Amino acid sequence: MTFFSELPGPSGTTVRLLNEQLYSLTVNGRPIAAATLLPEQLEEFAAGYLITEGITAYSEIESIMPDTAVIGVLTVNPFKVLLPRKTVVSGCGGTASYLDPARLPKVPNGDCLSLSGLTPDFPAEILAAGGFTAAAYTQTGRVASASDISQHAAFDKVIGSLLRQG
C-alpha cells in the first residue's frame, strides 16, 4: 500500500502528502466515532477501538465491513445499544477522565521482554512524515505492528490485529 500522494507544488516542486481519509465507525448502523486514518488495517482499527473504548467484547463482533468512508460493524445482538463506557482525556477535548493511574496494575519484572532484535520494520516514510507506529508482543511470541497518523489509531490497529489473530 502506498502511504503518500504526490501533488504538484510551488515552483515545479512535488509535495508528498499522507493518504489520510476520514472514516465514520458505525455499530449496528449507529454512528460511534469519526477518525482520520490511513486506509489500511481498517478492520483491525474497528476491533481495537471497540475493545479499548469498552464498547463491546471482541466475541460480540459478528462482522466488520470497511467501505470508502464508513467502517460498519455488526454485532451478535444488533438490537443491543452499545455506548462507550469510559471517557479519557485526549487532545483538546476537555472532558473528564475516569482512568486512575494509581490503580493500574504494575508489570512484574518477569513479564518484561527484551526487545533486542525484536523491533519490527517500521515504515521510515511514515515516521519522517510525522506519523506513528506501534508494536505489541505477546508472551506466546505473537507480534503485531501498525502505522497511522495518530498514536491512538496505531495502537487500536495493533490491538485489533492481535485479537483477529486469535
Feature-to-residue mapping (PLM):
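Intrinsically disordered, low-complexity regions enriched in acidic/Ser/Thr/Pro/Gln residues
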Residues: 1-134, 139, 144-152, 156, ...
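Acidic, glycine-enriched active-site microenvironments
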Residues: 166
